[in-house]
């Protein structure tokens, strides 16, 4: 069985002296695993960095076998993010979450398109506005991932009152939005719902990003990784830690340059 297609590199690990065991995400074949001979060597290692888009060629005698992979880089997303700690953390997170969440060999064409688009945005710009845009983009992507896996969040109306305005909470049990009025005395038991999930023009502030990561992380942990007996990926946890570091009122300005030393709802 042979095929050739654009693929997003999700992970690459050393296999033998210089070979790379890679996990790729493709439009027609979903997540696939393969062996790149010499993939960790000096000439090829940069190509197979997680987050890069490559033109991959996969060959195996049978579909269930570990394929032999070769390819050329199309888009060097990983290198573009090296100048920003947060951009690289975002890119690493979407790769790790995708790699851990999706079953091998199942087609998710729409999610592949969304993931490739998002990966191409990280590190493209710099500054506070770019940081906000990247975090909002990542959080919306995580919502799309949940939806594509069958765990859509319902943000259209309040689960208690039916109203569509002032939706500021989400039920951790049902994934349905709750208005300020509908929350009442149960507000402390609900997840804060950042406005960036409702308004495409809203990119939020660090407190919103932290709340958003907690929100999507709750459903990823419970609905996606829990049944697989897997923890939330380490790259996703690191991203949440970086965002949390932006919230401390007494912190020094963080180095994001990449140069590191029961509610009724």
Task: Give the predicted meaning of each segment.
Residues 1-21, 25-265:
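Non-catalytic alpha-helical scaffolds and adjoining flexible linkers that form interface surfaces
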């Amino acid at each position: 069985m042979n095929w050739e297609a654009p693929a997003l590199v999700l992970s690459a690990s050393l296999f033998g002296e210089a070979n790379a065991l890679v996990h790729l995400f493709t439009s027609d074949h979903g997540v696939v695993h393969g062996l790149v001979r010499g993939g960790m060597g000096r000439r090829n290692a940069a190509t197979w960095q997680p987050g890069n888009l490559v033109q991959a060629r996969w060959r195996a005698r049978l579909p269930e076998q570990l394929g032999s992979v070769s390819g050329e880089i199309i888009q060097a997303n990983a290198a573009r993010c090296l100048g920003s700690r947060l951009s690289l953390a975002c890119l690493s997170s979407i790769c790790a979450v995708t790699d851990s969440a999706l079953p091998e060999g199942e087609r998710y064409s729409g999610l592949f398109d969304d993931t490739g688009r998002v990966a191409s945005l990280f590190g493209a710009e710099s500054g506070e506005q770019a940081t906000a845009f990247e975090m909002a983009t990542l959080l919306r992507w995580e919502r799309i991932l949940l939806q594509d896996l069958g765990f859509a969040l319902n943000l259209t109306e309040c689960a208690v009152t039916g109203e569509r305005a002032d939706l500021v909470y989400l039920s951790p049990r049902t994934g349905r939005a709750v208005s300020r009025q509908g929350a009442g005395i149960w507000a402390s038991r609900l997840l804060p719902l950042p406005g960036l999930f409702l308004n495409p023009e809203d990119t939020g502030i660090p407190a919103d990003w932290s709340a958003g990561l907690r929100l999507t992380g709750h459903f990823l942990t419970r609905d996606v990784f829990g049944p697989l007996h897997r923890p939330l990926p380490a790259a996703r946890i690191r991203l949440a830690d970086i965002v949390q570091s932006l919230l401390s009122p007494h912190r020094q300005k963080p180095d994001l340059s990449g140069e590191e030393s029961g509610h009724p709802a």
